[in-house]
């Protein structure tokens, strides 16, 4: 007869009865989010190779004061708060980096460091996570700028054309749009605090919006990761073309 432990080990960081490699759930998050953070920081401060022809890196969009008339630093630093704030306060990303970087907790049924007076997101600085719904509105504004950049990427010297960069930028803003509009805040905006859609003002429109946002919201994690890779690759591609490492292939 096999003895099966029935009591939990002493509560401490990493204590668990799990026998699987639970740390493999958070290791990719540390690598990807950490790597993206380093790359994005370097690119934001680089202040170079962010545009070529009709292409503009999403890290620098909208491009503000590139001639440094009143802002002496990288233009990317002016708009960083919008995309960064939206992702940093995102419900999914909060779960991901709380586990991966803060080990709070590291995984399901895995112990965390014992502490006193746990206050969660009710104390500074984590209480600022509650402004996520307002970052959503700001993110929608940035999506509009990025769609403008995507449309502009079809114009080469005033004539219609398609390059590899056109496809990269268009795919990127599509994935960013799916990530943005799959946000929990939009779903709550459409259907929150409602028990009866047909009784509410614009009930049918709100119900339709709620259904679509619910469908997208169920895939929010997928869109979060896909859009993270796409925005990083879009910037990387524009940089490589701008510095002459890559040659943009014209498809049309």
Regions found by a protein language model. Give the residues of each.
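Membrane-embedded alpha-helical bundles that constitute the cytochrome b-like, heme-associated redox core
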Residues: 1-252
């Amino acid at each position: 007869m096999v003895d099966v432990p029935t009591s939990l080990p002493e509560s401490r960081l990493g204590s668990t009865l799990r026998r699987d490699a639970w740390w493999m759930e958070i290791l990719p998050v540390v690598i990807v989010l950490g790597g993206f953070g380093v790359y994005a920081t370097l690119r934001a401060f680089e202040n170079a190779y962010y545009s070529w022809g009709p292409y503009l890196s999403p890290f620098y969009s909208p491009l503000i004061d590139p001639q440094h008339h009143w802002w002496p630093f990288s233009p990317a630093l002016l708009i960083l708060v919008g995309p960064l704030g939206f992702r940093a306060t995102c419900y999914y990303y909060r779960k991901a980096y709380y586990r991966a970087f803060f080990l709070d907790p590291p995984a399901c049924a895995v112990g965390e460091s014992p502490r006193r007076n746990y206050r969660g997101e009710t104390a500074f600085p984590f209480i600022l996570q509650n402004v996520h719904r307002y970052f959503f509105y700001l993110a929608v504004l940035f999506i509009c700028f990025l769609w403008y950049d995507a449309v502009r990427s079809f114009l080469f010297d005033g004539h219609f054309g398609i390059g590899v960069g056109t496809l990269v930028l268009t795919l990127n803003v599509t994935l960013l749009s799916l990530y943005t509009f799959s946000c929990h805040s939009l779903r709550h905006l459409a259907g929150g605090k409602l028990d009866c859609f047909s009784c509410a003002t614009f009930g049918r429109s709100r119900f339709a919006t709620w259904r679509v946002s619910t469908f997208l919201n169920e895939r929010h994690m997928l869109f979060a990761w896909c859009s993270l890779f796409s925005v990083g690759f879009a910037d990387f591609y524009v940089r490589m073309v701008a510095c002459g490492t890559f040659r943009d292939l014209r498809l049309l």
